[in-house]
Structures are given as C-alpha cells and as structure tokens.
Amino acid sequence: MKKNLLFITLILITAASCVKDRNPPAAGTGGGTQNLPSGDTLMYYWNFNNQDSSARTADYSVPGLTGMYNYSASYIDFTGGSNLNLINGTDSGQCLRVRNPSQDLIFSMPTTGYDSVVLTYAEEASSTTSGSTINTITYTTDGVNYISTALTNNGGSNQASIGIVFGLYTFNFSSDPNVNNNPKFAVKITFSNNNTGTSGNDRFDNISLSGVRQ
C-alpha cells in the first residue's frame, strides 16, 4: 500500500511540473508591467536577461510555436534593461543592444492558430546623435515581401521616433486578415537617422506578441 501511494505521489508531482513548464508567464500588475488586451494570449516574449547573443529564440513561446529574431548588420550585446512591459516573474535585468552601423532587426513569429495580433516593446536610443532615432515597421505574410498595410491604413503610421529614455511602442496588426493563422508572419524594424556611424546603438527590451486564439 505504501509503495502504491509513493508511486501515485511521484506521478502527481511529475504532472504538475510539466503543466508549470507549459504555462505562459502571467501578465504583471503594477508600474510598467504588461496588461494584455482582454481575451488575448501571450504568444512570444523576449526579456534578454540570459545575455546569450547566440540564443535568438524567444524566452517564451506559446507551446507548439517558436519565435526567433535575426540581426546581421553589425553586432549585438546587452546592457541594463527597462521596467516597461515586464512580464510577471521577471525583472528589468538586461536588454538587447543593437549596435551601429545598423540596418534592420527581424522577428519571426508564426501566428498559427491565432488572430488579432499586437506587438509591444520598450526601446531607447543611446543618444540624440548616435543610435537610430527613427524606426520603420513593416511585416510579411508570405515570408518574402514586407508591407505596412495594417499599420498605415486609416491614417496610421508605421514609423516610430525613438528617444534617449525607454518608451513603450505598440503596433496592432489586426486589420490585415492575412496576418491571422500565418506560419510565415514576421516583423522587420528598419533603422534610419544616426544609424550609419561606428558608434551608437538602439536598445530593445520586453518584446511581446499577443493574439486571440482561434
């Protein structure tokens, strides 16, 4: 009888551990933390606290999908992060530092099984004279061509002015049905204005993509 009870206990502990590993980080509460739109699911999240430039996969990806980023222009490293858009259970830690000369940063984030996706992240430039102060946001639904349709229709903009203090940036792709349930969805951030020098950088932290499960 005691052996049977021990066996059952071990099974329950193992099952609980597996469920915990599959659960997404909860949205935080308090200053600077993330508040997902009602009904949204966190799909991908990068906090860069592991400081591993070779690990391009998201710190969290919804089970069954994998988010990755790619930056090939210059080199990247890490520095002190931001408390904007934090996910509960993490701290400001480190952020991704994209160094000049910079071109673009691409986040591949399949939306298979989801729609109404929203991208949110914190960013700052290293100074007003070095480090890109203008970012242009485009996205692809076919894995080849990058467009701005969902961001610029109805008078919207796909450009962001970047300051020297971390700001929060949000881009909503819900108006383009081709983004929904799309394994080829990716977002490109193209740098301009003070991005061609040999010094300076832009810093990204707490990047999240949320969506509604279909």
Language-model features and meaning:
Residues 137-141:
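Conserved Ser/Thr-centered positions that define the repeating blades of beta-propeller domains
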Residues 65-116, 201-203:
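Surface-exposed, low-complexity/disordered Ser/Thr/Gly/Pro/Asn-rich loops and linkers
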Residues 112-115, 124-132:
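Extended, low-complexity, turn-rich repeat/linker tracts enriched in Gly/Pro/Ser/Thr and Asp/Glu
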Residues 5, 15-42:
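Bacterial Sec-dependent N-terminal signal peptides
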